[in-house]
């Protein structure tokens, strides 16, 4: 998260927690016409998977947070507040969230290039808390990336496991079942014309 997003997350986290949900992270996206402030919320880990975030949770958080932002006013100018569940391509904001999703595939965007790249895709192997880093399996190698250098990270959904894998389209044309009737022919089985 950016410094501004971290500041806002620290400000709003107690309010969100008091509503029985967890603030996963904040995205602050400034733009010339007005910024977007996006909050990602989820149910506490102890209540998963029995309970999931629904529209009512998002509306409740939006109302309470909006009132707090009006009083605290941490953002100058116009902005749009969005409150969302993490979705299947869940964003990751903290080392604890990376640890919770060890073994899952992720897309990572770095602030500064590492090995000549800023974008990676790999499996979360483990957290190196001492180094403040996440270790990924990328292209068959273990790659350690400093947490402070991670700009964005999202889980890559396993569409097959979710039962949502795209189906291969059928080839156009007539389908053959192997039980088609043969048309009568003027030829015998040997391929010679029949005598009439």
Swiss-Prot record:
Chain residue ranges for the region called Disordered: 164-196
Keyword Cell cycle: no
Organism superkingdom: Bacteria
Location(s), subcellular: Cytoplasm
Key words of the record: Cytoplasm, Ribosome biogenesis
InterPro entries xrefs: Ribosome_maturation_RimP, RimP_C, RimP_C_sf, RimP_N, RimP_N_sf
GO biological process terms held by the UniProt record: ribosomal small subunit assembly; translation
KW Cytoplasm (keyword) present: yes
Pfam families in the record: DUF150_C, RimP_N
Bias-annotated ranges (Basic residues): 173-182
Cellular-component GO terms for this entry: cytosol
Function according to Swiss-Prot or TrEMBL: Required for maturation of 30S ribosomal subunits.
Similarity section: Belongs to the RimP family.
Protein name: Ribosome maturation factor RimP
Organism: Xanthomonas oryzae pv. oryzae (strain KACC10331 / KXO85)
């Amino acid at each position: 998260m950016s410094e501004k997003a971290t500041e806002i997350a620290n400000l709003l986290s107690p309010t969100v927690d008091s509503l029985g949900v967890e603030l996963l992270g904040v995205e602050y996206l400034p733009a010339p016409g007005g910024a977007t402030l996006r909050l990602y919320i989820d149910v506490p880990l102890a209540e998963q998977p029995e309970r999931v975030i629904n529209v009512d949770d998002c509306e409740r958080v939006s109302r309470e947070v909006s009132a707090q932002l009006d009083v605290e006013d941490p953002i100058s100018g116009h902005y749009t507040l969005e409150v969302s569940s993490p979705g299947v391509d869940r964003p990751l904001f903290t080392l604890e969230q990376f640890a919770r999703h060890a073994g899952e595939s992720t897309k990572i965007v770095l602030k500064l290039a590492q090995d000549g790249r800023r974008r990676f895709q790999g499996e979360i192997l483990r957290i190196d808390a001492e180094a403040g880093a996440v270790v990924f399996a990328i292209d068959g190698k273990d790659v350690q990336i400093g947490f402070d250098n991670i700009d964005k990270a999202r889980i890559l959904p396993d569409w097959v496991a979710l039962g949502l894998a795209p189906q291969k389209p059928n080839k156009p044309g007539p389908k053959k079942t192997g039980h088609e009737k043969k048309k009568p022919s003027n030829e015998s089985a040997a391929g010679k014309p029949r005598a009439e």
